[in-house]
């Protein structure tokens, strides 16, 4: 499957398209984003032994996160968390409207297929990392595997070795920036590190070899993205990539109707083929999805329920990815009389999960047509990003996007750039 990427850093999000359909929406978080690293402070009054957890103060603005003691690294002779202590921690679950961020002290950096973990690196190496070469990093990884591990994803057997080398370079790039900032710490608690490059979160979801074109909002960002790809990815030398840029972010939104995409993504009702529609309702406890046949009819009435559920399953998987729904999800399918139809639906649903790379755990399909499943929450859902308690208030997002200064896109840049041999920068009027 091939993808096209639209990166609009001015508006704080990027989108992943496949065959003219939006697959992912990736938001840039101002604070407590996924994989952000802090030097956190644990006050005495924030330790709760009965809960076996504590609340950690993350920065000078008194933002807090929740950390279970099982995810907190303690010294070998230490049984309890010492009050007023400081830990290097990382965000593994972003905060929602009513829940704080979930933290861990097992620090890691990741790319699409590689996961770099380090929890016990000796301090004598700290002065080496900012200026060390990539091969030296690999050597130290082999010499001290207990302190620095690189874990390979199970799908790496299908990945080109040049892709793995490129991802290793990106890990080294992030690794060096992290330790450079660690050496400059002057006060605690304090925010330490975030992947400031807006392109890196995309590489955590996709392989670069599956991307065709990039769309950015200015020539300067196109040049920066080209420099990043050539510097940190070896595969760029063998593959042609196009980077298309527009005069402003609003011009991109206007061409691709992104405002209407967000508006639709927050509406509870999603229409599919043949009049079938699904209704998505998000509450604090769970997410319910109701399948309705609508005006759909079939010549064979006994196959109507199964056919309706199969069509709705495709839209359900797409909406789970697009809206980033997580937690407990209950799907109310149209009732099916025959057990063979239920087995057919489950097999088809598992097939959709595999081809769409959605990490979902199926629990059971009850006799009344309720499919129970769970999905681990990491990023915020689209509702949490815009802090909409009631999803019917989708006009808030619509007004927010349209409030962008429409006069910006009138800037005329009378240029047509086609630069370099492997990465082409193309201006779109």
From Swiss-Prot:
GO terms for biological process: mRNA processing; rRNA processing. Its main location: plastid. Its EC number is 3.1.26.-. One of its GO terms (cellular component) is chloroplast stroma. Keywords: Chloroplast, Endonuclease, Hydrolase, Magnesium, Metal-binding, mRNA processing, Nuclease, Plastid, RNA-binding. The keyword Cell division does not apply. Binds 1 Mg(2+) ion per subunit. Disulfide bonds: none annotated. It is an enzyme of class 3 (hydrolase). Its cofactor is Mg(2+). Involved in intercistronic processing of primary transcripts from chloroplast operons. The endonucleolytic activity of the enzyme depends on the number of phosphates at the 5' end, is inhibited by structured RNA, and preferentially cleaves A/U-rich sequences. This is Ribonuclease E/G-like protein. It comes from Guillardia theta (Cryptophyte). The lineage of its organism: Eukaryota, Cryptophyceae, Pyrenomonadales, Geminigeraceae, Guillardia.
